[in-house]
Regions:
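Short, Lys/Arg-rich flexible segments
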Residues: 1-172
Length: 172
């Protein structure tokens, strides 16, 4: 086996295995064993990172030379993966107000705990809508791709397996 083929096997195996592992992070709601931070208010529409599945489906992996690279086509992937701050815009404020009115509309006619849950959500949107344009909004880190001890373990396992396969092919 040529070295180029050997390296290609390792890179391809790494791409497949790690892409599957990174995808499972969305199901685990964690970066391997590091749980994601909870949202400030519980949401009735499911997990923050799984509501639409757009971010999860946007992840692509490519082999570039001697490396495997993961990318996403959605603009918010980096801030979700690494955390950070975003500046509130007028457009965001309009969205927050729309979500507030939607939440208070959904609360009408409900009683007890259901009404309280919608009220908490409505108050959250109202608080965001009342923030000034230019204020910073902190986005908590919810890493789904990157370096981790589990990634290192998987890569080592892949390399060891491919070395053993190559040695077995030499001895035949």
């Amino acid at each position: 086996m040529e070295f180029k083929d050997f390296l290609n096997h390792i890179l391809t195996d790494t791409k497949v295995k790690l892409t599957e592992a990174f995808d499972r992070n969305f199901e685990r709601k964690a970066f391997f064993d590091d749980k994601w931070a909870n949202t400030l208010i519980p949401n009735r529409r499911g997990s923050l990172m799984m509501r639409t599945g757009t971010l999860r489906r946007s992840i692509r992996s490519n082999i570039e030379g001697t490396t495997v690279r993961w990318t996403s086509s959605v603009p918010y992937a980096d801030i979700q993966n690494n955390g950070g701050e975003v500046e509130i815009t007028a457009k965001m404020k309009r969205y927050f107000w729309a979500m507030y009115y939607k939440a208070i509309g959904a609360a009408k006619g409900r009683k007890g705990a259901a009404k309280k849950a919608f009220s908490v959500e409505a108050e959250h949107w109202k608080a965001l809508a009342l923030k000034q344009v230019g204020n910073k909004l902190k986005i908590l880190k919810r890493q789904f791709i990157g370096n981790h001890t589990e990634v290192k373990r998987m890569v080592t396992e892949i390399v060891d397996f491919n070395i053993k396969e190559a040695l077995n092919n030499i001895h035949q």
